[in-house]
Amino acid sequence: MPVVDQNAIELPPRISEASVADYFALLKPRVMSLVIFTALVGLMIAPGHVHPVLGFTAILCIAVGAGASGALNMALEGDIDVLMSRTANRPIPRGRITRGEAMGFGLTLSFFSVMTLGALVNWYAGGLLAFTIFFYVVIYTMGLKRRTAQNIVIGGAAGALPPVVAWAAATGSLSVEPLLLFLIIFFWTPPHFWALALFRSDDYARAGVPMLPVVAGPDATRLQILLYTIVLVAIAAAPWPLGYFDWVYGVTSLVLGAGMLVLAINVYRHRTGSTALRATRRLFAFSILYLFALFAVLLLDVLAKAVAPLIW
């Protein structure tokens, strides 16, 4: 017969200390903003007319799906986030949200974003969004990040898929153009994140994450940054001579590519001291501008062509 301690204190149920801002932080809003922008470009360059309501629904679902991926990523990485200065102030390491709450939040958003996109737009896009979430959470976060220095290279496919999903939402199919956007983002990802990893290598080493600078060393990472940047510049410029994007995009890609290449060469050349740190930080910052400007030109070109008949 069980013995009941009459003097035991009954603890009240746990009350979550999380605020709306904490749940919003789980969505990784900076990453989400880039996803929204690249997806918008994928939607806008698609042929034909997309009803504004369906277009808005598609972008919203892609954004929510990206946020859901971020929440699930944080739920799965709470143990390493607490060890890294860059992530130690996130809601889970600070104890404001539990990993279980973040997991439930992410799974709920994942379900509704995929189902809404499929039901209201088309299931081709819905399926691609589901695959994107699965790839980021299961393949990258659970499978690759803690096991291989190529985590960013392979996992970068998830971050490159939003414009493909948006194109599929607009057309119900795939074509060369969204695949070109995919390749640009895919080859942009390693130089961008390896530049970050170079000046955050102590963080990754402390958390046991096998980023390339930790596993292969900074010099090998600098070489890989340079090689991937060369490939990126070539792939980003290719759509112009191939006839997919016009000369405005082509010239912009060459100018921006020259900037990326110069900064990548500087990272490769400067290997010690404050000069090396400054070179990696400059490349990291410019890489964000590079991708934004490249996609902005495509978006502005579409808008200009839409407005021109109204003016002339």
From Swiss-Prot:
GO terms for cellular component: plasma membrane. It catalyses: heme b + (2E,6E)-farnesyl diphosphate + H2O = Fe(II)-heme o + diphosphate. Keywords: Cell inner membrane, Cell membrane, Heme biosynthesis, Membrane, Transferase, Transmembrane, Transmembrane helix. Pathway: Porphyrin-containing compound metabolism; heme O biosynthesis; heme O from protoheme: step 1/1. Gene3D superfamilies: UbiA prenyltransferase (1.10.357.140). Coiled coil: none annotated. It is found in: Cell inner membrane. GO terms for biological process: heme O biosynthetic process. It is an enzyme of class 2 (transferase). GO terms for molecular function: protoheme IX farnesyltransferase activity. Its EC number is 2.5.1.141. It is a multi-pass membrane protein. Its main location: membrane. Disulfide bonds: none annotated. Belongs to the UbiA prenyltransferase family. Protoheme IX farnesyltransferase subfamily. NCBIfam families: cyoE_ctaB, PRK04375.1-2. Converts heme B (protoheme IX) to heme O by substitution of the vinyl group on carbon 2 of heme B porphyrin ring with a hydroxyethyl farnesyl side group. This is Protoheme IX farnesyltransferase. It comes from Nitrobacter hamburgensis (strain DSM 10229 / NCIMB 13809 / X14).
